[in-house]
């Protein structure tokens, strides 16, 4: 089954779950591990290999948005043992006791992690000791080279002006521009473009970014965190805000569909966010020992390699990186060089009032009011 079909299937399963289904659950006496992860984050056959090698059964669920995780975990008794979660959002849940610290003594494969990469990724103090890193990347934009150059032959593509300058974006409206439907991904990039603090939540900064986004709103086809994964490979968009690995995924899906397309990925010179997904164990996990066995399995170099190669997201596993193709290791969209990394920033968690203020900005922009 292709990745495209899996995404559609995962979305359908989530919809069914929202209609009354329960997540994977089980008593602590069962020899299972209940896992909740992003769609397309584990390579085919990996789960089956874990079950075969350990004798531990895996109940594996996927999700499309981080908000889904928050609802399940804050409600309590989710039944999950292992959850892959964005470190920024996970830090909020740690504050209210949702996650427990991992036992590093049970994770000998931590030795495979690259100390230098780990130093660069160590941007959230609040999650230290609570996870093992899984994948990481940047937030930028993917663009169709041919479609953009037809309309803007001389436009520099190292700037977020391609997204936020009305004069430029208006010339791309006919071929399609999409924005993230996420305050944690959209607003920091927009604030950085205005030369403001990307984590600003003060009234003046939010008013400025809202005004700018409303100016380009007529030229934005839609706001979504995943629809562009279907539309970009089919040439139904020419520019899409995206996470770094999705650029490579879009190319792969185009190849699978036999579509000839030239895509590129840019990290804006004004700045872009860095994100990190960690693997967490909920405080009320029913199978904590099995959870550690699963975490250690994911840290194995051969398994980390397969998952990184399949998902097209960067891995912090040094042993696994050595197994990747030279083209992948040298792909600046997946593994940015030091110059590109100097332009990325961390996004900070905010309190409920600040989050509501940011959410109101996005809601007004989406409605065009």
Ranges and model annotations:
Residues 69-71, 91-136, 155-156, 161-164:
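Hinge/lid segment of periplasmic solute-binding proteins
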Residues 338-369:
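Conserved C-terminal helix/tail region of periplasmic/extracytoplasmic solute-binding proteins
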């Amino acid at each position: 089954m292709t990745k495209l079909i899996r995404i559609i299937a995962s979305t359908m399963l989530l919809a069914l779950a929202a209609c009354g289904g329960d997540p994977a659950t089980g008593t602590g006496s069962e020899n299972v591990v209940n896992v909740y992860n992003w769609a397309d984050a584990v390579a085919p056959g990996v789960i089956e290999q874990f079950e075969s090698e350990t004798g531990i059964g895996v109940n594996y669920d996927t999700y499309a948005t981080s908000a889904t995780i928050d609802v399940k975990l804050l409600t309590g008794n989710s039944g999950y043992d292992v959850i892959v979660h964005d470190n920024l959002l996970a830090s909020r849940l740690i504050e209210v006791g949702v996650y427990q610290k991992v036992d590093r003594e049970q994770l000998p494969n931590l030795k495979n992690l690259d100390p230098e990469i780990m130093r660069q990724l160590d941007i959230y103090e609040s999650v230290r000791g609570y996870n093992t890193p899984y994948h990481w990347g940047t937030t930028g934009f993917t663009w169709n080279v041919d479609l953009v150059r037809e309309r803007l032959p001389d436009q520099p593509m190292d700037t977020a002006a391609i997204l936020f300058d009305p004069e430029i974006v208006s010339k791309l409206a006919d071929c399609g521009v999409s924005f993230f439907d996420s305050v944690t991904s959209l607003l920091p990039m927009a604030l950085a473009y205005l030369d403001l603090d990307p984590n600003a939540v003060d009234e003046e900064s939010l008013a400025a970014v809202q005004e700018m986004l409303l100016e380009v709103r007529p030229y934005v086809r839609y706001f979504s965190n995943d629809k562009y994964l279907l539309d970009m490979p089919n040439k139904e968009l020419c520019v899409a805000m995206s996470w770094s690995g999705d650029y490579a995924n879009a190319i792969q899906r185009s190849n699978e569909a036999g579509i000839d397309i030239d895509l590129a990925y840019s990290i804006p010179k004004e700045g872009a966010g860095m994100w990190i997904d960690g693997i967490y164990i909920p405080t009320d996990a029913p199978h904590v020992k099995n959870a550690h066995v699963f975490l250690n399995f994911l840290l194995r170099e051969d398994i980390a390699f397969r998952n990184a190669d399949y998902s097209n997201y960067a891995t912090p596993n040094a042993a696994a990186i050595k197994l990747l193709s030279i083209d992948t290791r040298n792909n600046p969209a997946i593994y940015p060089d030091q110059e590109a990394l100097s332009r990325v920033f961390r996004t900070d968690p905010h309190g409920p009032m600040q989050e509501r203020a940011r959410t109101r900005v996005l809601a007004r922009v989406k409605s065009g009011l």
